[in-house]
Swiss-Prot record:
Protein name: Protein OPG056
Primary localisation category: virion
Family: Belongs to the orthopoxvirus OPG056 family.
Cystine connections: none
Gene: OPG056
Compartment(s): Virion membrane; Host endosome
Protein species of origin: Camelpox virus (strain M-96)
Length: 635
């Protein structure tokens, strides 16, 4: 089994081999090392990310294990309460989702009945979901003629003498609860089909839920510490035995991983006496250090670990940064060299426990020397980038592309006086994220050639992006940028699917789409009904000139870093759902998808195998490579 995986890794440069490798990753986690000896844990959820960061054919496969884990994500965002919008029809009134729909009904009826309006103004009414309490209030104000009557009771002839009574249709709706509809006209009323929606767009559009990105960039921190976790191979999988820090201590324990971690956490707590947040800086820590510690994380230790964040029970926070994501693919020694510190080797990971014990004294010293070099390089790089990308600071970002693009967008925004905003509320963020589709759309299975957009940067830098806070609109305005909750109906004829949906048996579904994706889908024959949208009246102009200026500035500082950064920006948009430029990523991905579809339109559909926002698989038998395809690169 191990030999088979080792061979697959050495030849994992084509789609078929990678798919076979994925099958093994459903059962095992691959233990690998790079040329510098740094451990890397490869599992089914992170292999794509690893392949985007490095050439996996150059990794050394050490073993397979089931005794490991993935990064522990932050607690999931609670599901938002499903939403029904208000419907005021000539035959009925259905209030929007509310804890007190009966109160909404009586307030709506007061628009027609002045005596109800006067009583509400004089006396007010307490919130209640009880019909008997509503009727008691009406009776006490001399308004018993408007008493609330359930539709079923009215039909039993029990209340026919009350000609002015408020007849309500009572129901229970899943994930919402009790709901009532005021029946205005019994002769024409039929219970309506009401869309139960995943988002309340009006609520999401509230001004206080949106913050200008520039106001979130000027942050300070007190302390930075370089850190590295070393792991040895045991019968039960990889085991951490040493945690080194600089400046700081080295912790070693071959007998109890729990004690190793607790000693490290006690030391962290001691140095946080004067600050609530510190920064730990590792190298490839997201690929080895953090997931390895997560496996052994002690219960009831006073700290929780979520991805790269440690949070203590008293609210102290440790951000564990991965400097590799700011290196543009450089090895640790090259990174240190390029940022002016002396490159030093580090102890190898994933060695036998007995070898680690035998060499521990020399490896403690070697680890400290390597960490000192990493610390100095990181401090130099962060200082330089914070000048060039002011006011962005490295510790506020998870990778260099995000920092670079944020600085460009902020600069353009400030120069034009039109800032980009981002959502601060979990539900608002989830709505925006829901419009982002990174999945492959499968058309058919056939032997195919893979093509990728030649320059993502060229496509996205010439487009427009939202500026200012959004407004709520029922339907988006043509020519403006907006994100809408949509009811989508797929075409009845043969078609290339454009809007991703994971249920092939459903022809109508509700999803979130950008105005760019709506235009693309409509062109492809989809029927789309907009159920509410966030719309922006202003746009940030083209980013191209500012992008080029920023690239030149970084190039003058460090040509190797800039070339690698530029290559990453050209090849990919690494979407980051925690980014403050979430809106930029949303529309950038839509623009790329629209470009891919414009190419699909020029090709006979029988040759299309699958596609994503940046890649297109075309049948190997297709020979008519047209001029449009010149903007794609064959992989």
């Amino acid at each position: 089994m191990l030999n088979r995986v080792q061979i697959l890794m050495k030849t994992a440069n084509n789609y078929e081999t990678i798919e076979i490798l994925r099958n093994y990753l459903r059962l095992y986690i691959i233990l690998a090392r790079n040329e510098e000896g740094h451990g890397i844990l490869i599992y089914d959820d992170n292999i794509d990310s690893i392949m985007s960061m490095m050439n996996i054919t150059r990794l050394e496969v050490i073993g397979l294990t089931t005794h490991c884990t993935k990064l522990r994500s932050s607690p999931p965002i609670p599901m938002s309460r499903l939403f029904m919008d208000e419907i005021d029809h000539e035959s009925y009134y259905s209030p929007k989702t509310s804890d007190y729909p009966l109160i909404d009904i009586i307030r709506n009826r007061s628009h027609e009945q002045g005596d109800i309006a006067l009583a509400l103004e004089r006396y007010g009414i307490d919130n209640t979901d009880s019909i008997s309490e509503i009727n008691e209030w009406l009776s006490s104000k001399g308004l018993a003629c408007y008493r609330f009557v359930k539709f079923n009771d009215y039909r039993k002839q029990m209340y026919r003498k009350f000609s002015k009574c408020t007849i309500v249709d009572s129901m229970i709706i899943g994930h919402i609860g009790h709901h009532y509809i005021w029946i205005k006209n019994l002769e024409t009323y039929t219970r309506p089909e009401i869309d139960v929606l995943p988002f309340d767009i009006k609520y999401i559009s509230r001004d206080e839920l949106w913050v200008r990105i520039s106001s979130s960039l000027d942050q300070t921190h007190i302390k930075t510490i370089a850190v590295s976790v070393y792991g040895a191979i045991t019968d039960n999988g990889p085991m951490p035995y040493m945690i080194s820090t600089y400046p700081g201590n080295t912790f070693v324990n071959f007998n109890s991983v729990k004690d190793l971690i607790l000693n490290f956490l006690d030391w962290i707590k001691d140095i946080m006496t004067s600050t609530r947040t510190i920064i730990l800086v590792g190298y490839m820590s997201n690929l080895f250090d953090i997931p390895l510690l997560t496996v052994y994380w002690p219960n009831n230790c006073g700290w929780k670990i979520y991805n790269n964040i440690l949070i203590s029970s008293d609210g102290a926070r440790v951000i564990w940064m991965d400097a590799y994501k700011f290196s543009c693919g450089l090895s640790l020694q090259d990174y240190c060299y390029h940022w002016g510190s002396k490159p030093e080797s580090r102890p190898f990971d994933l060695i036998k426990k007995s070898d680690a014990k035998r060499n521990i004294k020399s490896w403690v010293k070697e680890s400290m020397t390597s960490l000192k070099s990493l610390y100095e390089a990181f401090e130099t790089q962060s200082g330089a980038l914070e000048v060039l990308m002011s006011p962005c600071r490295m510790f506020s970002f998870s990778r260099i592309e995000d920092m670079f693009l944020t600085s460009v967008i902020n600069r353009v925004s400030e120069n034009t006086g039109m800032g980009m905003y981002y959502p601060t509320n979990d539900i608002s963020s989830l709505f925006i994220e829901s419009s982002i589709c990174l999945d492959y759309i499968i058309v058919n299975n056939q032997e195919s050639n893979k093509y990728r957009i030649k320059s993502v940067l060229d496509i996205i830098s010439s487009k427009q992006y939202p500026a200012g806070r959004p407004n709520y609109v029922k339907n988006g305005t043509k020519g403006k940028l907006y994100i809408a909750l949509c009811k989508v109906t797929v075409p009845t004829n043969d078609h290339i699917p454009v809007v991703y949906h994971d249920d092939d048996n459903t022809t109508t579904f509700i999803t979130v789409l950008t105005s760019v994706d709506i235009e693309t889908a409509t062109r492809a024959g989809y029927s789309i009904v907009e159920l509410g949208a966030l719309q922006w009246d202003d746009n940030i102009p083209e980013l191209k000139d500012c992008l080029l200026d920023s690239i030149k500035m970084i190039y003058d500082l460090n040509a190797a870093t800039t070339n690698n950064l530029l290559e990453q920006l050209i090849e990919n948009i690494n979407f980051n759902n925690s980014s403050i430029i979430l809106l930029f990523y949303t529309f950038a991905i839509s623009y790329c998808r629209a470009f891919i579809y414009s190419i699909i339109e020029t090709i006979d559909p029988v040759y299309i195998s699958q596609f994503s926002y940046k890649e297109l698989y075309i049948s190997s038998s297709y020979k008519d490579i047209n001029e449009v395809m010149s903007q794609m690169v064959k992989l």
